[in-house]
Swiss-Prot record:
Record note on quaternary structure: Part of the 30S ribosomal subunit. Forms a tight heterodimer with protein bS6.
Function: Binds as a heterodimer with protein bS6 to the central domain of the 16S rRNA, where it helps stabilize the platform of the 30S subunit.
InterPro entries in UniProt: Ribosomal_bS18, Ribosomal_bS18_CS, Ribosomal_bS18_sf
Species whose genome carries this gene: Latilactobacillus sakei subsp. sakei (strain 23K) (Lactobacillus sakei subsp. sakei)
The name this protein goes by in its record: Small ribosomal subunit protein bS18
Amino acid sequence: MAQQRRGGNRRRRKVDFIAANHIEYIDYKDTDLLKRFISERGKILPRRVSGTSAKNQRRLTIAIKRARIMGLLPFVTED
């Protein structure tokens, strides 16, 4: 009998960008950092896509929402 290989489709674990770069405070004025976690349509990327921890995702969400209210980031992008 021929042997079959198992496994194969192993996905690489996503790394928390904020923790990896030792960012302690997520500033709402740092739009370059915040844009990494926003989709092309202007939506906040979920944890399963961005790889952030739950704590950093909450901080990120608050910072993005503040930046939107202050006019630094758009609520939605136009096509």
